Amino acid sequence: MSDLFSFNKEKKNKLVDNNYSAKDIEVLEGLEPVRKRPGMYIGGTDSNAMHHLVSEVLDNAMDEAVAGFASIITIKMHQDHSITIFDNGRGIPIDNHPKFPDKSALEVILTTLHSGGKFSNNVYHTAGGLHGVGISVVNALSKHLEIKVYKQGKLYSQSYSKGEKLTDLICEEASKRLRGTSINFTPDPEIFSEKLHFNPKKIYELARSKAYLYRGVTIEWECEVEVPSDIPKKALINFPNGLKDYLSSKITLDNLIIPEIFSGNIESTPDEIKLEWAICWQNNDNSAFIQSYCNTVPTPQGGTHEQGLKSAILRGLKAYGEMIGNKKAANLTIEDILETASVVLSIFIAEPSFQGQTKEKLVSNGVSKPVENIIKDHFDHFLSSDKALATNLLEHVIAIAEFRISKKNEKNISRKNATQKLRLPGKLADCTRTTPGGTELFIVEGDSAGGSAKQARNRETQAVLPLWGKVLNVASSTLEKIVNNQAIQDLEIALACGSLKNYKEENLRYEKIIIMTDADVDGAHIASLLMTFFFLRMPKLVEEGHLYLAKPPLYRLTQSNKTYYAGDEEEKAKLTDKLSKASKAKIEVGRFKGLGEMMPAQLKETTMHPEKRSLLKVTLEDFQNVDKIVDDLMGKKPEKRFQFIYEQALVKMDKIINELDI
């Protein structure tokens, strides 16, 4: 106890000695905060964050279209990996700003956070861009940005780099028929990795999503870099029937429970809401998804508009069941109804409120009830217009509900009860915590790695499951093989959440599932087999964000009795160069043959300690096509695998050619 007080005293004295004065307060001006903390504005510095820059520029163009001022948007990906987005709208204002008389409005918008025309309803009734943050953030995080504005027979242009102005506003003569705004930019490799480039498929799908969200716009697509076989080099993208067209393109029509897509489109309401939706029910629950948008901005975390739709569908089916005397309908939940449903929802409202800068969840009050009333009214008409169709749908969702209810008694209410009921694998070193929150399961290969991991773990929160024998490739195996495989049996028993349609997140015994394999090629192969298992047998576990990859080191570098670790050859080279410049002392390099060769203390320090390790979260951008993607790469047909590798090689070769100094 005395040690505790002496420690606090020492700590207090250190704080007193450390003068905390005005000079310690940082004041970041202009776009400095964006470059210093990009994650606060775009959610990180990874590939998803970099593509968010494209979304911001495209959202601004879409705002012009939705407001009725633009009909064509052009997206062009260039050989140098820059991108140009043009809209034929009114063009950003170029006259001097009244608050900054020495600057054009264009320069103010590009260099000042929280500037723009979306703070009132005078310019845009509905808007999707980040209200004066989006384009200035793009400018701040771009190595180069050039903007062109066509207005009244003039072309106004200006160049920027990393948020700083390179040129004054230049005015030239141009055709009077041209109008609008063109923005070309290249993400800054100092912020994003030099290895990162725009993904043509991702941007093409983004363009498609914007086009179906607003029927009045045509998007011209052009890509100069190599594209996958399913992505065109050039295309005109337009969906005259909006969301219904889009949903039809995403599903297999002969796989529908009922042959009709329930869709609707309301242009305006007394609540000043524009609403569109499309819903269908399929035989395969792996095809289920919900995609929602507000003012063309994706809201992957849902929000009040989704709540309204869910309430409408649930109330509608329960009311129909009551009307025809089917008492089982009273037991329905929204999860039963949506288990095999594919849903697309779009809403346009004035002054939307989002959760966070990246706007992933709509939190606007006063949205849920109007959406519920509109969709409920249309759904009632949809069901009553075709009795056979409505009865088929009702019986389908009731069957799902009955299956859920039949399993209710088998559910493990707490993790403690689950542990008591399950005969856990003998090789599992379980953690002592009895609730899933904060717990982790490390999946390792063999006893050697398992032994080190068991000694390195935190026994309260970290469990270790060594897998014996060859990990099965479930993509090319029969159901009988999968069911009888010992490693898969052990894994499914340890997780306790079930698989495929029997998967239940509430039964999952751990918050994080971490695949921890050797840092070499063999380890990567085992990790790919395990990920294949999760993608095909437990895709919702991945979708819900429970699956991770550990990043153990491959090399150990020692200099002057100090130890450093590197994950791969490139990291080793950079670290060696850094250490050589800092000191002339000899650097000793050792290569780990595997996790089992590492001392428990090393494994804990580099790979397992939550505050010191680095984890990769496993995500999928296209859950609807996961079966096809995994089958192409991991399935029985080598020609599909060859095509996948060939397409990736083309992308890689394109990068290499563009980097050659010729």
From Swiss-Prot:
<feature type="binding site">
    <location>
        <position position="518"/>
    </location>
    <ligand>
        <name>Mg(2+) 2</name>
    </ligand>
</feature>
<keyword id="KW-0238">DNA-binding</keyword>
<dbReference type="GO" id="GO:0005524">
    <property type="term" value="F:ATP binding"/>
</dbReference>
<dbReference type="InterPro" id="IPR036890">
    <property type="entry name" value="HATPase_C_sf"/>
</dbReference>
<feature type="site" description="Interaction with DNA">
    <location>
        <position position="641"/>
    </location>
</feature>
<feature type="binding site">
    <location>
        <position position="20"/>
    </location>
    <ligand>
        <name>ATP</name>
    </ligand>
</feature>
<feature type="binding site">
    <location>
        <position position="60"/>
    </location>
    <ligand>
        <name>ATP</name>
    </ligand>
</feature>
<feature type="site" description="Interaction with DNA">
    <location>
        <position position="473"/>
    </location>
</feature>
<dbReference type="GO" id="GO:0007059">
    <property type="term" value="P:chromosome segregation"/>
</dbReference>
<feature type="binding site">
    <location>
        <position position="518"/>
    </location>
    <ligand>
        <name>Mg(2+) 1</name>
    </ligand>
</feature>
<dbReference type="GO" id="GO:0046872">
    <property type="term" value="F:metal ion binding"/>
</dbReference>
<feature type="site" description="Interaction with DNA">
    <location>
        <position position="470"/>
    </location>
</feature>
<dbReference type="Pfam" id="PF02518">
    <property type="entry name" value="HATPase_c"/>
</dbReference>
<dbReference type="InterPro" id="IPR005737">
    <property type="entry name" value="TopoIV_B_Gneg"/>
</dbReference>
<feature type="binding site">
    <location>
        <position position="87"/>
    </location>
    <ligand>
        <name>ATP</name>
    </ligand>
</feature>
<feature type="binding site">
    <location>
        <begin position="129"/>
        <end position="135"/>
    </location>
    <ligand>
        <name>ATP</name>
    </ligand>
</feature>
<dbReference type="InterPro" id="IPR002288">
    <property type="entry name" value="DNA_gyrase_B_C"/>
</dbReference>
<dbReference type="InterPro" id="IPR013506">
    <property type="entry name" value="Topo_IIA_bsu_dom2"/>
</dbReference>
<keyword id="KW-0413">Isomerase</keyword>
<protein>
    <recommendedName>
        <fullName>DNA topoisomerase 4 subunit B</fullName>
        <ecNumber>5.6.2.2</ecNumber>
    </recommendedName>
</protein>
<dbReference type="InterPro" id="IPR001241">
    <property type="entry name" value="Topo_IIA"/>
</dbReference>
<dbReference type="Pfam" id="PF00986">
    <property type="entry name" value="DNA_gyraseB_C"/>
</dbReference>
<feature type="binding site">
    <location>
        <position position="359"/>
    </location>
    <ligand>
        <name>ATP</name>
    </ligand>
</feature>
<dbReference type="GO" id="GO:0005694">
    <property type="term" value="C:chromosome"/>
</dbReference>
<comment type="subunit">
    <text>Heterotetramer composed of ParC and ParE.</text>
</comment>
<dbReference type="InterPro" id="IPR014721">
    <property type="entry name" value="Ribsml_uS5_D2-typ_fold_subgr"/>
</dbReference>
<dbReference type="GO" id="GO:0006265">
    <property type="term" value="P:DNA topological change"/>
</dbReference>
<dbReference type="InterPro" id="IPR018522">
    <property type="entry name" value="TopoIIA_CS"/>
</dbReference>
<feature type="domain" description="Toprim">
    <location>
        <begin position="439"/>
        <end position="553"/>
    </location>
</feature>
<dbReference type="InterPro" id="IPR013759">
    <property type="entry name" value="Topo_IIA_B_C"/>
</dbReference>
<dbReference type="GO" id="GO:0003918">
    <property type="term" value="F:DNA topoisomerase type II (double strand cut, ATP-hydrolyzing) activity"/>
</dbReference>
<dbReference type="GO" id="GO:0003677">
    <property type="term" value="F:DNA binding"/>
</dbReference>
<keyword id="KW-0799">Topoisomerase</keyword>
<comment type="function">
    <text>Topoisomerase IV is essential for chromosome segregation. It relaxes supercoiled DNA. Performs the decatenation events required during the replication of a circular DNA molecule.</text>
</comment>
<feature type="binding site">
    <location>
        <position position="445"/>
    </location>
    <ligand>
        <name>Mg(2+) 1</name>
    </ligand>
</feature>
<dbReference type="InterPro" id="IPR013760">
    <property type="entry name" value="Topo_IIA-like_dom_sf"/>
</dbReference>
<dbReference type="Pfam" id="PF01751">
    <property type="entry name" value="Toprim"/>
</dbReference>
<comment type="similarity">
    <text>Belongs to the type II topoisomerase family. ParE type 1 subfamily.</text>
</comment>
<dbReference type="Pfam" id="PF00204">
    <property type="entry name" value="DNA_gyraseB"/>
</dbReference>
<dbReference type="InterPro" id="IPR020568">
    <property type="entry name" value="Ribosomal_Su5_D2-typ_SF"/>
</dbReference>
<feature type="site" description="Interaction with DNA">
    <location>
        <position position="525"/>
    </location>
</feature>
<keyword id="KW-0067">ATP-binding</keyword>
